[in-house]
């Protein structure tokens, strides 16, 4: 699995398209993705400015790029009374298909807990109002994260995906019971940090699994192909998909077909 393989069309549901790491090589990154068979992707937003920028320009770069609009918990301190209106404008475009990346992150605390809760709650309200999926982030805040979602959705399923799931079977079960889809990144390839995720992998229903790189972050361990830097790229998604297929005993072609169909079902991205 050391080299990128050209495979049946893959859909990367998590790319940080306007990361500074891609600033001088955006088109090259997109070209390599296409060469590797990654023909579709979701470019995820972290604040209002990035949401607007993605909304205005990302689909021009590549025919099958969809976007999100939202405020990451790290940027929750930037949330104000105008934020929801700005996100609402982006979401009027059919290419803007989810609210996020939003949630709670009590690990690095770039925004206070109260700021994060306020921004998260308002974005949930908007998602419920518009009937669009949530693109969810959670780190070191599981219990409160689940509590906030349950309080606002009640007994209804939560329409959305847990971005970059890294946790254990018990937490996986909670998310699945809420109706959520599960996004798996190259974290699963890490021998030490990915142990819980690998243990949980076989318990993710086939119709709830999504695959993503979270590029340029989380370059999969064990990859020894053409890239010599630490940067991750969407063209490495075939490596991640093949790793997941081997871990779960699935046929690679079927896994790719299933995860792509799951993505279309959740985000309504089928052209």
Summary of predicted features, one role per range:
Residues 1-271:
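Mid-domain alpha/beta scaffold segments of enzyme catalytic cores
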